[in-house]
Amino acid sequence: MFGVEPISFCEDMTMIRPRIIVIGVGGAGGNAVNNMILSKIEGVEFIAANTDAQALGLSLADRRIPLGGYVTKGLGAGSRPELGRSAAQESIDDILTAIDDANMVFITAGMGGGTGSGAAPVIAQAARERGILTIGVVTKPFHFEGGHRMGTAEAAIEELQHVVDTLIIIPNQNLFRIASERTTFIDAFKMADNVLNSGVRSVTDLVVKPGLINLDFADIRIVMSEMGKAIMGTGEAEGEPRAVKAAEAAISNPLLGDTSIAGAKGVLINITGGMDMTLFEVDEAANRIRTEVAPDANIIFGSTFDEKLDGKMRVSVVATGIA
């Protein structure tokens, strides 16, 4: 349905890498991007886009794009999605210039406010129309934020899911499943951001890092293109049986609710370990996940090395086409 953008060459021309961009839209999206940058994820470019000039000034992103200077004057969208939408439309040429030769774009935003709810669908549609593999990763409000904000969020999600290839939804209310009475507000949101972080890392590691089994970008596109709703999960474990424990943690992410990977049409599995990781362990982890999905699911599998993980294994799963 959509064309594939040409892939850019690395400076030394010895290998080809896809250009992957994460765009944080609005305040929550900008915070998620900052947390990803601080985690030092490799092989990704970052863009922050916001109607709030003050918040944009605090971004750590490679590129910062003010949205709707004429319609918002840099003062934000004031919880009005229609203003966020107009702001994105005003600045869409700046967005398209920044992502013009990208192969994959993750768009992250908080749903329920003005900028994220209004601007994210506009940006997603523009990216996808350019043939860019477009993934949305968004949060839904806490219950205590009220019915009006939740209604705004649900309307924005309904719009967004029609203009992205794959959409991951993280209900903030589910943070209570993993938070304790001592968990700070900042740390709680970092937990939600880790879903985005692990999902992006599971893709980039497979095409950037050396490993037993590497994937090319075409494999990833097959699993994530035009797939609708998805879930992401990452598990890390040490000790025996670390492979199985990591796999089970990856497919039981409490932040994503009660959604199961059982009905997934496509599954991307990334198994990462140190140089002590054995072929038997890779087989164990992959088979543990495979037993959870339908026999006809399209499973794309890769395994990479990370010297920092000696003694540990990390399993990441992206399951797409969730009913």
Swiss-Prot record:
Keywords, in A-Z order: Biomineralization, Cytoplasm, GTP-binding, Hydrolase, Nucleotide-binding
Superkingdom per UniProt: Bacteria
PROSITE patterns assigned to the protein according to its UniProt record, in alphabetical order: FTSZ_1, FTSZ_2, TUBULIN
Record localization: Cytoplasm
Enzyme Commission number: 3.6.1.-
GO BP annotation list: cell septum assembly; FtsZ-dependent cytokinesis; microtubule-based process; protein polymerization
Catalyzed reaction equations: GTP + H2O = GDP + phosphate + H(+); ATP + H2O = ADP + phosphate + H(+)
Gene3D superfamilies reported in the protein's UniProt record: Tubulin/FtsZ, C-terminal domain, Tubulin/FtsZ, GTPase domain
Gene Ontology CC, one term: cell division site
GO function term, MF aspect, one: ATP hydrolysis activity
Induction info: Expressed in exponential phase, peaks about 18 hours. Fourth gene in the 4 gene mamXY operon.
Binding locations of GTP: 27-31, 114-116, 145, 149, 193
PANTHER family: CELL DIVISION PROTEIN FTSZ-RELATED (PTHR30314), MITOCHONDRIAL DIVISION PROTEIN FSZA (PTHR30314:SF3)
Subunit field text: Interacts with FtsZ. Probably interacts with MamX and MamY.
HAMAP family found in the cross-reference section: FtsZ (MF_00909)
Chain's role: Required for synthesis of single-domain magnetite particles and magnetosomes, especially in the absence of nitrate. Forms filaments, which form bundles in the presence of GTP. Has both GTPase and ATPase activity; GTPase is 2.5 time more efficient. Has no activity on CTP or TTP. May be involved in redox control for magnetite crystallization. Mild overexpression causes cell elongation. May recruit other proteins (MamX, MamY and MamZ and possibly Mms6) to a complex required for biomineralization.
Miscellaneous comment as given in the Swiss-Prot or TrEMBL entry: This bacteria makes up to 60 cubo-octahedral magnetosomes of about 45 nm in diameter which contain membrane-bound crystals of magnetite (Fe(3)O(4)).
Family: Belongs to the FtsZ family.
Protein name stated in the entry: FtsZ-like protein
Gene behind this protein: ftsZ-like
